[in-house]
UniProtKB/Swiss-Prot annotation:
Subunit structure: Part of the 50S ribosomal subunit.
Organism: Mycobacterium ulcerans (strain Agy99)
SUPFAM superfamilies recorded: Ribosomal proteins L15p and L18e
A GO CC term attached to the entry: cytosolic large ribosomal subunit
Protein name: Large ribosomal subunit protein uL15
Known role: Binds to the 23S rRNA.
A Gene Ontology molecular function term of the record: rRNA binding
Gene3D superfamilies listed in its UniProt record: 3.100.10.10
GO annotation terms (biological process): translation
Residues covered by region (Disordered): 1-54
Pfam short name (any one): Ribosomal_L27A
Family membership noted in the UniProt record: Belongs to the universal ribosomal protein uL15 family.
Amino acid sequence: MTIKLHDLRPAPGSKTPRTRVGRGEGSKGKTAGRGTKGTKARKQVPTTFEGGQMPIHMRLPKLKGFRNRFRTEYEIVNVGDIARLFPEGGTVGVDELVAKGAVRKNSLVKVLGDGKLTVKVDITAHKFSGSAREQITAAGGSVTEL
């Protein structure tokens, strides 16, 4: 005989009805699982209450200031990083920086002037700092903003 889906039944005793407490002396009435006397037997205690100890939400400092939701975040690449990643120079764009692992793809790139640049590099990025512009042009390269 094969078992069919409509023949399946839960094991006896596995499905018992939910016990409704506090509904008469005969069935978990009277204290209804709350024990005897005390605050927790008589009313609900707030979840933040820690027995008189200063609660954690009052011990921690308040959050101050605010975070601008419309701020544009740039991935930062320093001139020194470009000199290290491209020692022979040439043209460097966002795609080349992504390929070398300097920045993540689909991100805005800002070039900063930390480090030294000695080779001629033509860089294309979204933003440049003043010192980065100076170093790139001093080395004979060019700067192009997207």
